UniProtKB/Swiss-Prot annotation:
One cellular component (GO) term of this entry: cytosol
Functional description taken from the UniProt entry: Catalyzes the ATP-dependent condensation of GlcN-Ins and L-cysteine to form L-Cys-GlcN-Ins.
Protein encoded by which gene: mshC2
Annotated binding of L-cysteinyl-5'-AMP, by residue: 60-63, 75, 98-100, 243, 265-267, 299
Gene Ontology biological process terms in this record: cysteinyl-tRNA aminoacylation; mycothiol biosynthetic process
Cofactor dependence: Zn(2+)
Ranges spanned by the short sequence motif 'ERGGDP' region, renumbered to the chain: 203-208
Enzyme Commission code(s) on record: 6.3.1.13
Keywords: ATP-binding, Ligase, Metal-binding, Nucleotide-binding, Zinc
Coiled coil: none
The name this protein goes by in its record: L-cysteine:1D-myo-inositol 2-amino-2-deoxy-alpha-D-glucopyranoside ligase 2
Motif 'HIGH' region positions after renumbering to this chain: 62-72
């Protein structure tokens, strides 16, 4: 599966040339990136490979049965910040994102709408690519559909069966389940107690009441074929993969048995990330799949949780079709911390557009290399501290107010790029490299 087109990303400046009577300035080196890890319940440094290899990041992608809403955008915006920061700091990154193009919600929506599920998946994946391009999200090195990796899933399920970490349920449909007790560390990622796990497992796609399972919390690895459902051949019988093992196979086959960051929305904390880690660890014989498990908060709309069931989704494509600047959508999402549940409204978007206009007016007239170096150092410091974007916005607001006041800016007229000073160009490049926002 092909990814989307990459935006141009300027190099983060290491120094700023002199401007008129203002001397040149050095930009401080980017501090190490520290992110909150759900498993360890603390903010800690992202571990970099000892051999200088690229930092491995796996982010769970869409199930392509509907358009990209702001909840999706907030998640991919967050991990784009991580990706951009690491690259600006001089590190290589291998970013992997899946598409769950084999799953019940997709089949159900296609059946409801009377369309082929494959065509629906293709259509929505194409729209997702368009939305990511509009938002200037860096494309993953590997953008992978589940259908492309059935052989990898079959291999992992076979390994789990051979190790005794999986078993076949007797009955009309010989489904295969993972024995969640096989790995002693099961539960470390979410840190939930069993009662909470049982409740969420039932709410989020699990089948605790399935007869023949050894334990209610054992998760489906392979669903034996049912009439009318898609199927793929496997040594243990035709069928289709479970959700969690898809991500386990895709991640480990591209990033190795252990990698730096597993990411997604907070609703994936359990069961999805718990089980995908458990499947990978059981198959590979490791204690921990990812060094960080990073989760983004939920987005509400006008005070109500945004959800497909409520039908109150705000779609990226609809906002851009109305003429809103995609950069303003990003800035609006930066107004809240990525781990917090936060609200989206017309007011948030309007404030973001106003804020962006002020930044652009100030950036166009910036002529002080030392001030630019200080602003970039402060911004990188906030980003390094668990992606503290609200503090980044405050820093840029204060900077813009000072610049605009000093030049008496009115109407936010933007100087053409060709006429800008070296300080202005360095600031623009730095913010674009880090935030994906052109000022």
């Amino acid at each position: 599966m092909h990814s989307w087109s990459a935006p141009r990303v300027p190099q983060f400046p290491s120094s700023i040339p002199a401007v008129a009577d203002s001397p040149a300035a050095e930009v401080a080196a980017l501090p190490e990136l520290r992110l909150y890890d759900t498993a360890d319940d603390r903010v800690k440094a992202v571990a970099l490979p000892d051999d200088g290899a690229p930092v491995g990041i796996y982010v769970c992608g869409i199930t392509p049965y509907d358009s990209t809403h702001l909840g999706h955008a907030a998640t991919y915006n967050t991990f784009d910040l991580v990706n951009r920061y690491l690259r600006a700091a001089g590190h290589g990154v291998t970013y992997v994102q899946n598409v769950t193009d084999v799953d019940d919600p997709l089949f159900e929506r296609a059946d409801r709408d009377g369309v082929d599920w494959r065509e629906l998946g293709k259509e929505q994946t194409d729209l997702f690519r368009s939305d990511m391009t509009q938002l200037r999200i860096l494309p993953p090195e590997f953008f992978v559909g589940a259908m492309e990796t059935i052989d990898e899933v079959v291999e992992m399920v076979s390994t789990l069966l051979d190790k005794g970490a999986a078993y076949v349920v007797d009955g009309e449909y010989p489904d295969i389940y993972a024995d969640h007790t096989y790995t002693e560390q099961f539960g470390y990622e979410s840190r939930y107690d069993e009662a909470t796990m049982r409740e969420l497992f039932a709410e989020r796609g699990g089948d605790p009441e399935r007869e023949g399972k050894r334990h209610p919390l054992d998760a489906l690895l392979w669903r034996a074929h049912r009439t009318g459902e898609p199927e793929w051949d496997a040594p243990f019988g035709s069928g289709r993969p479970g959700w969690h093992v898809e991500c386990a196979a895709i991640a480990t086959n591209r990033l190795g048995e252990q990698f730096a960051i597993q990411g997604g929305g907070v609703d994936l904390r359990y069961p999805h990330h718990e089980y995908s880690a458990a499947h990978a660890e059981a198959a590979c014989g490791n204690q921990r799949m990812a060094g960080h498990y990073v989760h983004t908060g939920m987005i509400g709309l006008e005070g109500t949780k945004m959800s497909k069931s409520l039908g109150n989704l705000e779609f990226v494509s609809a906002l851009t079709a109305q003429g809103f600047d995609p950069a303003a959508i990003r800035v609006g999402l930066y107004a809240g911390h990525y781990r917090e549940d936060r609200d989206w409204s017309a007011e948030v978007l309007n404030e973001a557009e106003d804020r962006l206009a002020k930044w652009r007016a100030a950036a166009a007239e910036e002529n002080n290399p030392q001030r630019v170096a200080e602003v970039l150092a402060t911004v990188t410091g906030h980003l390094a501290n668990d992606l503290d974007t609200p503090s980044v916005l405050r820093t840029l607001d204060e900077w813009a107010a000072a610049v605009n006041e000093s030049i008496g800016a009115s109407g936010y007229q933007v100087t053409p790029a060709a006429d800008r000073t070296a300080a202005s160009q360095a600031l623009t490049a730095g913010l674009d490299a880090l935030l994906g926002v052109s000022v």
